[in-house]
Amino acid sequence: MSKTTRRISTLFAAIALAGAASYSLAAEPIKIALAGPVTGPVAQYGDMQSIGALMAIEQINKAGGVNGSMLEAVTYDDACDPKQAVAVANKIVNDGIRFVVGHLCSGSSQPAADIYNEEGILMITAASTTPELTQKGHTLIFRTIGLDSMQGPTAGNYVVNQLKPKRAAVLHDKQQYGEGIATAVKAALDEANIPVALFEGVTAGDKDFSALIAKMKMEDVDFVYFGGYHPEMGMLLRQSAESNFDARFMGPEGVGNSDISAIAGEASEGMLVTLPKAFDADPKNAHLVEAFKEKKQDPRGAFVFPAYAAVQVMADAMTMSNSQDPEVIAETLRNNSFDTPTGVLEFDEKGDLKNFSFIVYEWHADGSKTALTE
């Protein structure tokens, strides 16, 4: 073989190796952990997050991915349990994943967020509404949903101005999310001088509320707010109807899903609930709604589109910054606006959305709902 031939062969080999290395780098997926309840009494919320996030990943990958890399979801089950959430967070750290969509329950998000921020992992929750989550000075924690401090006044204002109850009971499940939103609603009632006859907690998982219902009947309560999730609210509604306790019930987005109709049956008719806007009804999202339906998935869940938005803003920030460094992406999130299926999103320095609206809905026994506010 001549020197010239050898040089050409060597050159082609070098080019081939460089190309292979480049292809290997480009093909390396960007892993995103989906952390939330896969099992447990509120696993339905994990399903909402999952279908929203996975749809976003699918759509982004179809469009070419992020800077030449595909996105890949890795699911972790925290069962909405704070201790399990810590174990999940540590597993994500050990697995070398630097991006998280989750967690859902505020009590799980808080301890997990501490770990992620310490370990340099970017977290965007589509469901945790407790203000405390973003009040610790963390720089890598964001959310694509509003706060209890927004949702509480929305509920309170409706109750004060539209329902005008004579005596109220404000209940919660003794957990961070439920007690937090219940406290915000009580504050609105107190400010309006509406008597709150009872403010107390129930234990998550309880199924017998007969004593509590008897107490509310004795106190002539005509309005009940429950801060918590659908399993307890469903039982409260059903047992209240069975006890002929005729009060209007209301709860946050944690009670607003189809399972409550399965638990409470006809007793769920007329329940009031604060939820994000029905993003599935927005004409600009028609193509996504159709894509969900083709997969036989329900796009109506409160956290479906916020989870989609969480993945999208994460990917958009990677593209804008041409980086996979969580710190760089966090800074990009804080300094740009993002057009998503939930609207144009802008984040403040703490990682909260600058604007987000909750709407009061009337729930129907068939699982449908009617908007009462805009």
Label each PLM-derived region with a short phrase:
Residues A20-A26:
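Sec/Tat signal peptide C-region and signal peptidase I cleavage site
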Residues S9, A18-G19:
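Gram-negative bacterial Sec-dependent N-terminal signal peptides
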Residues S2-F12, A26-E374:
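Extracytosolic ligand-binding ectodomains
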